[in-house]
Structure formats: structure tokens, C-alpha cells
């Protein structure tokens, strides 16, 4: 049976840096660096789901959310992901990681390009994300 999954992620800014989190060894995509976020639960409001995922993965509260872009990808013949990527801001740089992640960095523009995987960088390029972010 075909499956559609809605994933939400956020580029979180604090002091002109972007939060990247590194996946744990047990998780799919192990050791990959990513921006925080995850799946929307049935019946959940979009921003409530985004806030929940960010709190679960980082312990942070965010504000000023703005939808930057949407994308879709077939990850298998029977599974499609719809992804929403937001921009938001953190009040603090004190991150508390969940078991899904093992490290984090408040990244500069150079670190973003070095650490993010190619599909995410391609999405950022397609939507001119690095051009609109006010980061060092």
C-alpha cells in the first residue's frame, strides 16, 4: 500500500548561525548532519507539530516561523515524502539532544556547505536559501 508522509524541518537561527544536528549511529542516515524537524502526527496543527519535533530533538523553543519552501520526493516505489522547510529563531543556544542525535553545531555559512548532505544542499540552492539567510 502506498504511503504519503509529511515531514517538517526548520532552519533555526541564533546569533547569525544555523543549528545543525548529527544523527545517531542507530538511526537511518546515521552520522548525517541535518536541520531539526520530523513527521506530523495525524490531527496535529502544522506549527504545533514543528514545535513538538524541535523541542523533542533539541530542547529549544522557536519563534517567528516562516515557510521557505516545499518539496516532494519518492523514497521508494511505495513511499512519498512531502517536506516543508521553515525559517525560525531560537531564544537560546543551549541545545539538549534527544537519543536520535549525537552532536550539534551552530554553523556558519561555510560549515553548512561542508556538513549538509547533497540533497539538502541541492534544495537550498534551488530555493536560494543561502542567499536569503543572514548568517556569517
PLM regions: where:
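Conserved Nudix-box catalytic region and its N-terminal flanking loop in Nudix hydrolases
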Residues: 14-56
